[in-house]
C-alpha cells in the first residue's frame, strides 16, 4: 500500500503511483515545462523585449502566481523558524536561480545556441558528482550508464542542429559553464536544504529573491538599450511572458523541487533532459524548424537514459522526503 503524498498546490492529478513514481513524473513534467522557454522567449524577443527583462519578468510573474496558490492551497512555515543553515540555503538557491537565468540568456547572445546547450546540459554530471561527494547517492553502474546514454543522445541532437555558421567564443563557453554550475547548485542545495518548507512556498521565496537580483541587472542594461519597455504594446509579448512566468517558472520550479525531493538530484537531472526534446518539438511546431535524423536518434538516446535513470533502488523507493 502506497503512502499518500502531501498536496500543496501545483500537484499532478491523483494517480495510482508510489511517491517515488510520482517524483519521476514531476521531474519529467518540470523538464517539459522548462523546455517551452526557448520558443516562447523568441516570441518575446521578436516583440522587442530584452533578455534580462524577460528573465526578470518571468521570475516576478512566477513568484506572484505561486504566492496566490501558496496562500490558499497549503500550510505555511514561518521563515523565521528556520535555522541559519536553512535560511542560508534559501539565499544560495535564489542566487543560483538568478545567476542561472542571467548567464544562460547572455550565453545565447555570445555563442551559437547549440554550443551553449552542449555545455549547459552537462549539469547532470555535476549534480551526480556533488551528490556522491556529499554522500547522498552512490555512483552505481546503472546511474553511470543512464547519464552516459542520455548525454550522448543530447550531444547528437545538439550537434545535428549546428549550422556552418556556428562559432565558439570564450565568453560564451564561460557563461554556459556558469549556467550549468548554477543549475547543479540549485538541484543539490534544494534537495535537503529546507525540507520543512512546502514546495510551493519554497519556490515562491526563491523566485522572489531571484527576481530582485535579476531586476538589478535588467533595469540598467535594458533601460539604456530601450528594450525595457519597447515591448509593452505588443500582445504577443504579454502572452509569451505570462506563459513563461506561470508555466516556465512557477509550475516548472515547483514540479522540479517536488521531483528532486522524491527521487534525488541525479535522477531528476537526467529525467529533466526532456527539456531540450520539448524545445526541439516546439521549435518545429511554432517556428517551423525541421526535425531530422539526428534529433530522432538523439531523442531515442535521451529516452533510454531516462528509462534507466528512473529505476529506483529498493532503499530509495522506500525513502521519500516527507516535506514534498
Predicted regions and their residues:
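Specific transmembrane alpha-helical segments of multi-pass solute transporters/efflux pumps
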Residues: 33-38, 70-116, 120, 156, ...
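Hydrophobic/small/kink-forming positions within alpha-helical transmembrane segments
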Residues: 35, 39, 60, 94-102, ...
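Specific alpha-helical transmembrane segments that line the substrate/conduction pathway
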Residues: 53-64, 97, 104-138, 143, ...
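Membrane-interface helix termini and inter-helical loops of multi-pass transporters
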Residues: 39-51, 78-79, 158-169, 220-236, ...
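Hydrophobic alpha-helical transmembrane segments of multi-pass integral membrane proteins
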Residues: 21-26, 53-72, 146-152, 171-178, ...
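Hydrophobic transmembrane alpha-helices of multi-pass small-molecule transport proteins
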Residues: 66, 139-161, 282, 294-313
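Helix-helix packing/entry segments at the starts of transmembrane helices
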Residues: 31, 57, 116-122, 189-212, ...
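Glycine-/small-residue-enriched transmembrane alpha-helix faces in small-molecule transporters
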Residues: 2-57, 95, 103, 165-192, ...
Amino acid at each position: 500500500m502506497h503512502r499518500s503524498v502531501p498536496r500543496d498546490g501545483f500537484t499532478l492529478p491523483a494517480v495510482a503511483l508510489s511517491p517515488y513514481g510520482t517524483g519521476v513524473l514531476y521531474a519529467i513534467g518540470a523538464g517539459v515545462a522548462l523546455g517551452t522557454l526557448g520558443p516562447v522567449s523568441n516570441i518575446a524577443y521578436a516583440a522587442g523585449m530584452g533578455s534580462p527583462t524577460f528573465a526578470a519578468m518571468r521570475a516576478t510573474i512566477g513568484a506572484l502566481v505561486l504566492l496566490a496558490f501558496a496562500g490558499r492551497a497549503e500550510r505555511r512555515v514561518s521563515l523565521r523558524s528556520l535555522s541559519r543553515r536553512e535560511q542560508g540555503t534559501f539565499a544560495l538557491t535564489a542566487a543560483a536561480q538568478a545567476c542561472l537565468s542571467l548567464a544562460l540568456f547572455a550565453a545565447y547572445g555570445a555563442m551559437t545556441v547549440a554550443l551553449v546547450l552542449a555545455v549547459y546540459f552537462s549539469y547532470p554530471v555535476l549534480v551526480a558528482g556533488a551528490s556522491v561527494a556529499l554522500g547522498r547517492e552512490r555512483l552505481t553502474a546503472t546511474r553511470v550508464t543512464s547519464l552516459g546514454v542520455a548525454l550522448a543522445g543530447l550531444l547528437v541532437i545538439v550537434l545535428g542542429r549546428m549550422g556552418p555558421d556556428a562559432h565558439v567564443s570564450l565568453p560564451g563557453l564561460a557563461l554556459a559553464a556558469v549556467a550549468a554550475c548554477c543549475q547543479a547548485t540549485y538541484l543539490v542545495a534544494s534537495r535537503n536544504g529546507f525540507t520543512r518548507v512546502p514546495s510551493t512556498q519554497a519556490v515562491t521565496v526563491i523566485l522572489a529573491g531571484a527576481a530582485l537580483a535579476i531586476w538589478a541587472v535588467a533595469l540598467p542594461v535594458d533601460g539604456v538599450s530601450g528594450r525595457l519597455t519597447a515591448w509593452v504594446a505588443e500582445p504577443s509579448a504579454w502572452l509569451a511572458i505570462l506563459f513563461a512566468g506561470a508555466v516556465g517558472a512557477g509550475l516548472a520550479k515547483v514540479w522540479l523541487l517536488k521531483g528532486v525531493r522524491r527521487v534525488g538530484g541525479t535522477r531528476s537531472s537526467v529525467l529533466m533532459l526532456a527539456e531540450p526534446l520539448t524545445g526541439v518539438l516546439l521549435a518545429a511546431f511554432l517556428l517551423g524548424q525541421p526535425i531530422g535524423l539526428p534529433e530522432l536518434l538523439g531523442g531515442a538516446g535521451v529516452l533510454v537514459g531516462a528509462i534507466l535513470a528512473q529505476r529506483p533502488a529498493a532503499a530509495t523507493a522506500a525513502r521519500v522526503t516527507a516535506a514534498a
